[in-house]
Regions:
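Acidic/polar, glycine-anchored loop/turn motif associated with catalytic or activation segments
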Residues: 1-118, 125-176
Length: 176
């Protein structure tokens, strides 16, 4: 099943199951905070670095170019509030699609002892179609015994060969 995505939104949809990546590095002190006491399900639960959130969350990022064209300053994608993201993508539908995709992939990978910490998706403007790749470059995948199977190998100082080795290992694990 395939279709051409016309006018793809400049939005990356991120599903976060663990307090890692952007959330860990940008939100000072969040890694030692607690869920509000009046929360109906998770009152007082501690948020810890590298640990699971009470449940996966979906957020929307504006995709910046890697370099600012005039100043050549390195840019990062920026987190958007739902109301702003909804100008470009059907947030309600995209949230459902992202959560369903994450759930299906999590169930599949759990059979291989792999946990998804987070996943970045490209979803159509109507919020109903995931397009583009789902790869080790757009998520954080951890094996119970083998550790990181994604781009964090490189971020931790690993060589290109080590990254390819982990990615090939992930490929073998999910195709056999």
């Amino acid at each position: 099943l395939a279709r051409i995505i016309k006018d793809a939104p400049n939005i990356e949809v991120v599903v976060k199951a663990n307090h890692t990546g952007t959330s860990k590095h940008r939100y000072f002190g969040m890694g030692k905070s607690h869920v509000r006491k009046t929360h109906p399900y998770y009152a007082g639960m501690e948020i810890k670095d590298m640990e699971p959130y009470p449940e996966p969350i979906v957020r929307f990022d504006w995709r910046n170019p890697f370099w600012e064209p005039d100043t050549h300053k390195m840019l990062a994608d920026e987190v958007m509030c739902d109301a702003q993201a909804d100008y470009y993508i059907d947030v309600k539908e995209a949230r459902k699609t992202a959560a369903m995709t994450f759930s299906v992939l999590s169930d599949f990978l759990a059979e291989k002892d792999i946990v998804i910490y987070d996943l970045c998706l490209f979803i159509s403007e109507d919020g109903k179609t995931v397009y583009g790749e789902i790869s080790p470059d757009c998520g954080r995948y951890r094996h119970y015994d083998l550790g990181s199977l994604d781009k964090d190998v490189w971020r931790a100082g690993g060589s290109s060969d080590q990254v390819l080795e982990k990615w090939n290992l992930l490929y073998k694990m999910i195709t056999q």
